């Protein structure tokens, strides 16, 4: 487990490394990591935030999660609510997921804003126990379409694509 100050730093550091591996990810900012780690003064759930880091054999942080347990009234169980989960390697991601799904006295893990290809469905024995929901999150307006497309790399670059864009605002 990590102290909240350390958790905020690790989340930011890992996000910066991991976001370059996935198109469309944006940079984070210190206030975001402080909020995820439970350091925001207005956060009513801040006291309940916990953090865990997954380290490789050299001791480097490769995955981390900020979460809180929400007790289910009348039961001796809780829902584990993930605030932020980040990993810069497949092994670290599997390690963090393993920690979450094997947490004591938890009968539900709730995670928002995961990629559609997140491997959790394939990491559990009962795939029917995993429920996913797809919804919009990041919206953006690309002002320079050619520059945006040229900044990416593409597999199978022998392909030629013609793209038309109509934007009444410019």
Task: List where the protein language model places each region.
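Intrinsically disordered, low-complexity, positively biased terminal segments
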Residues: 2-170
């Amino acid at each position: 487990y990590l102290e909240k100050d350390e958790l905020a730093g690790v989340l930011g550091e890992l996000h910066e490394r991991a976001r370059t591996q996935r198109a469309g990810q944006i940079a984070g900012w210190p206030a975001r990591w402080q909020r995820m780690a439970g350091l925001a003064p207005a956060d009513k759930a801040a006291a309940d935030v916990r953090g865990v880091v997954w380290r490789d054999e050299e001791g480097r942080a490769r995955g981390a999660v900020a979460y809180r347990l929400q007790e289910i009234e009348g039961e001796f169980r809780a829902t584990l609510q993930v605030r932020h989960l980040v990993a810069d390697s497949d092994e670290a991601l599997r390690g963090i997921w393993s920690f979450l799904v094997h947490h004591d006295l938890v009968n539900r893990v709730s995670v928002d804003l995961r990629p559609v290809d997140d491997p959790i469905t394939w990491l559990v024995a009962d795939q029917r126990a995993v429920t996913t929901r797809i919804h919009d999150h990041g919206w953006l307006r690309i002002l320079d379409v050619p520059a945006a497309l040229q900044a990416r790399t593409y597999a199978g670059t022998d392909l030629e694509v013609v793209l038309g864009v109509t934007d009444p605002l410019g």
